[in-house]
C-alpha cells in the first residue's frame, strides 16, 4: 500500500484528508501557531529594513541626560573622552623611515 492511499482516501467522489473536521485541541493549537508564525514571518520580511535599522541605530544612544545639570553632563563627556584618549596609547604607531 502506498503512502498516498494511507493519507488520502476517496470520499464521495472527491479526495479528502482524514484529519478534516478534527476537534483535537492539539491540532487546533498547532494550526493557530502555524498561522501566527506565517503572519509574523511575512511581516518580518516586509518590514526588515525598518525594524533592524531602528535596532541598529536607534539603540546606540548613550544614557539619558534628561534632568541632569549641564555641569554634570560636561563632566561625563570629559570622562568618556579621557577614557577614549587613554585607550589610544594601547596602539603602536609604526612610521616608515
From Swiss-Prot:
Residue numbers on the Virion surface membrane side: 1-22
One Pfam family assigned to this protein is: Flu_M2
Q: Where is the composition biased (Basic and acidic residues)?
A: 71-80
Name positions with the PTM Phosphoserine: 64, 82
| Membrane side Intravirion: residue ranges | 44-97
List residue numbers at the site (Essential for channel activity, possibly by being protonated during channel activation, and by forming the channel gate and the selective filter). Answer: 37
UniProt entry keywords in alphabetical sequence: Disulfide bond, Glycoprotein, Host cell membrane, Host membrane, Host-virus interaction, Hydrogen ion transport, Inhibition of host autophagy by virus, Ion channel, Ion transport, Lipoprotein, Membrane, Palmitate, Phosphoprotein, Signal-anchor, Transmembrane, Transmembrane helix, Transport, Viral ion channel, Virion
Q: How is its activity regulated?
A: The M2 protein from most influenza A strains is inhibited by amantadine and rimantadine, resulting in viral uncoating incapacity. Emergence of amantadine-resistant variants is usually rapid.
Which biological process annotations from GO are given for this protein?
protein complex oligomerization; symbiont genome entry into host cell via pore formation in plasma membrane; symbiont-mediated suppression of host autophagy
| Compartments in which it is found | Virion membrane; Host apical cell membrane
Q: What membrane topology does the UniProt entry give?
A: Single-pass type III membrane protein
Specify the superkingdom.
Viruses
**Lipid tethering residues (S-palmitoyl cysteine):** 50
The entry annotates sugar attachment on 20
In Gene Ontology terms, what is one molecular function of this protein? proton transmembrane transporter activity
The segments labelled Disordered in the record are 60-85
Task: Name the HAMAP family for this protein.
Answer: INFV_M2
Other information: When the channel is activated, one or more imidazole moieties of His-37 probably become bi-protonated.
Domain free text: Cytoplasmic tail plays an important role in virion assembly and morphogenesis.
Q: How does it assemble?
A: Homotetramer; composed of two disulfide-linked dimers held together by non-covalent interactions. May interact with matrix protein 1.
What family does this belong to?
A: Belongs to the influenza viruses matrix protein M2 family.
Protein name as it appears in the record: Matrix protein 2
